[in-house]
Amino acid sequence: MPGLAEAMPEISPDGTTYKLKLRKNMKYSDGTPIKASDFTYAVQRLFKADSGGSVFYDVIVGAKEYADGKADTITGITTDDNTGDITIKLTGPNGTFENLLALMFSAPVPPTTKLDGDTTNTPPPASGPFMISNVDAPRTMTMERNPQFKTVKDAGASEVADANVDKITVVENKNQSAQVTDIVQNKVDFMVDPVPSDRLQEVKTRYADRFRMEESINTYYFFMNTQKAPFNDIKVRQAINYAVDPEALNRIFGGRLLPTQQVLPPGMPGYQEYKLYPGPDMNKAKQLIAEANPADRDITVWTDDEPDRKRIGEYYHDLLTQLGFNATLKVIAGDVYWTTIGNQSTPDVDTGFADWFQDFPHPDDFFRPLLNGASILPTNGNNLSRANLPELDAKMNELLTKQITDPGVEQQYADLDKAYMEQAVWAPYGNEQFTTFLSERMDFDKSYQHLLFKQDFTSFAVK
């Protein structure tokens, strides 16, 4: 639905030009007027800050030239601050672009926002129902009702929900069991993390009136660096897929992990269940390792220090050891995990824990940022397996020019899924379910967890 824009984008018949009009007289939380040119600035920031989201927007005419420092602006975006008109020209038709315009990556920000620096502790002003009023990363963050959100509502964004509470304080606590105890004792109102496996049955049984399971569209997998030994050998990668036991990993999650062996998760267009590597089959896995006979058997296994993820890493480390590798487990802090393993200068990023949650409801979101060769970035990369398969990239690019509703497109995405798994670029093992658990003072029935954006903070309400 339209938010800051007056209506959904007007798309040219050839699918290469998108036109929008910004609503009039809207302001950011600090009182700065929201201008059409702020959209251009927001997209430019993605490339200057090496954002992992930049890969979505390189389909805009001139984006690559701007990213390479060959242009001062992105020529495919033109705006008029007087009329609010925004025109975006693409290099070709793109079946996902309407979704991309709704992502937080492209949310307008004023030009006073740092172009190429970290804004964690100095967040830009907000245009939504809440603003970030204080940050002490990574310990605390405070969100308060945006005093200027009325200008957005008055401009016509009537369908965008307003906040029910005046203030939300977020406090870091990596001990998930302690989080549960705090909610039970009504010291905390909500936990972002799912209820841990060792407390799940207790919470389900004793606090059923304020607990529920939540569906989520995601895939958990082990990445394998396909550009260096031993994972540059497909037989080694296939062996890992045969050896991994999704049910063993499900036990780590307390039964919240639905087993899988593919890229696309249930609920995503193009999903068709299949299993190329029936198992777990350690005999088959060891046979493939013997056939590959890798000369380099020294492997560093990466994971972060969140309890479930650490246990996943320990499981994977033990599995690789059983397969005859000299595996070293490297556990690092969760708040730097993705930037560390997504940096090509980080040594020994061989294999490890990874997951991906949908950015938007289109299968390209599970292929382009994670498996396209163009997504192998120097920093903030999400193609952790360094997959670079030109034939499959070409198919991915071809599908991008079509709409997901076009005849046969969903089937082609299902075929693309299988083609990547025939190359065993990942070892997927599960799709996680989440939880909502609230304190007694919260209105449980009003609380809403969005399938895409997770907890809707505007739905929080005190009884």
Q: Locations of the language-model features?
A:
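Periplasmic binding protein-like
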Residues: 31, 321-374, 408-412
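Bilobed periplasmic-binding protein-like "clamshell/Venus-flytrap" ligand-binding domains
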Residues: 95-101, 291-308, 348-355, 402-440
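Alpha-helical secondary-structure segments
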Residues: 35-42, 83-87, 128-129, 162-167, ...
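Append "and occasionally in soluble cytosolic enzymes with long acidic Gly/Pro-rich linkers
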Residues: 144, 232-323, 328, 386, ...
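Short helices/loops that flank or line small-molecule/ion binding pockets
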Residues: 31-32, 38, 177-189, 206, ...
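Surface-exposed binding/hinge segments that line
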Residues: 19-21, 33, 38-40, 48, ...
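Extracellular/periplasmic solute-recognition and catalytic clefts
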Residues: 133-144, 169-228
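Short, solvent-exposed loop/beta-turn-alpha elements that line the ligand-binding surface or hinge
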Residues: 1-13, 63-66, 103-134, 148, ...
